Amino acid sequence: MELTQHEARVIGVLLEKELTTPEQYPLSLNSLTSGCNQKTSREPVLNLSESEVQNTLDSLAKKRLISEQSGFGSRVVKYKHRFCNTEFSDLQLNPAQLATICLLLLRGPQTPGELRTRSNRLHEFNDVREVEHALDELARRDSPLVALLAKQPGKREARYCQLFTTEELELTTNPILHKDAEPQTSSRAELEDRVSKLEVEVGELKALIQQFQNKSQ
């Protein structure tokens, strides 16, 4: 499944509002446009017109990722997603995974810590490890939905990005790490143990090279 930046924003807003304000869901074009252009909880901040949002909805409808719903006695058309967790969706996500994908669609690459802090209205993570577990599950799917970005210079933590929008990947200068890359939260003891094993292996290799050189002389 591939989305444009505008499609990702629309889907993200529909997911968010379904979870946080279910009484107002599905959304009208006006409400959806306001949600897309919010000044908070959105990165980047956009300024889409209703016409642009409507064009995006038309594109998503062709991909069968949204549907229209008209209320009884109302002429206002409202929109709901078919992105995941519906009878029409191939994609099924648990609550933790859904909250994670929603935030990545709305706010771009983020660290596990940022995702936990920003997810309180979508899903309650008890700690960062639960966020990392959700990210790991999403990254290890047959068709990965997220990937770990290389750590930025001067930053303590690496960020994760969603893989629905190729535009986002093209804009970043960070190489994408393999989905099976070791998480950056490995304990100090694990890292020290790994370094010790590597040092032993390097020492053995040096000894073998020295033996080979001695035989060649």
Curated annotation (Swiss-Prot):
Domain of life assignment: Bacteria
SUPFAM superfamilies according to UniProt: Winged helix' DNA-binding domain
Gene3D superfamilies: Winged helix-like DNA-binding domain superfamily/Winged helix DNA-binding domain
Pfam families (alphabetical): DUF480 (PF04337)
Family: Belongs to the UPF0502 family.
Xref: PANTHER family: UPF0502 PROTEIN YCEH
Protein name, entry field: UPF0502 protein swp_3027
Taxonomic path: Bacteria, Pseudomonadati, Pseudomonadota, Gammaproteobacteria, Alteromonadales
